Amino acid sequence: MENETHKAEILAQVMEKFDKNQCALVERMLSIMSNPVRFHILCALEKESFSVSELMVLSKSRVSNVSQQLKMMTLAGYISKERQGKQIIYTLKDGRIRELIHKLEELFGESR
């Protein structure tokens, strides 16, 4: 009985820490990052700002696909864009993405 009470307390703590709204935010972020093109773009933007054409070369994708992915991540609030002359430069905006990328590099980096 004591073990069941302990487990119920753990479950209550988890539910308090990650309510439905928090779970929705986590799901949204992981969904964005689960696409390989978006993930590579986010990893690049974590290091430096890039233009669409640079990200197109990096991701080996067509401009329409890169633009679509950038729009999705901009609308989600994870990246920002700024016009510099004729180019639009994208920058990582959300520090949580940066932290998550660092942790993923630590867990799944080349040396593993």
Spell out what each predicted region is.
Residues 103-104:
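Residue-level signal for well-ordered alpha-helical positions
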Residues 74-84, 91:
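Beta-hairpin "wing" of winged helix-turn-helix
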Residues 69:
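Residues within the DNA-recognition helix of helix-turn-helix
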Residues 107:
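An amphipathic, aromatic/His-enriched active-site/gating alpha helix that lines ligand/cofactor pockets
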Residues 24-64, 88-95:
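N-terminal helix-turn-helix DNA-binding core of bacterial DNA-binding proteins
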Residues 96-100:
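Short, charged/polar, Gly/Pro-enriched secondary-structure boundary elements
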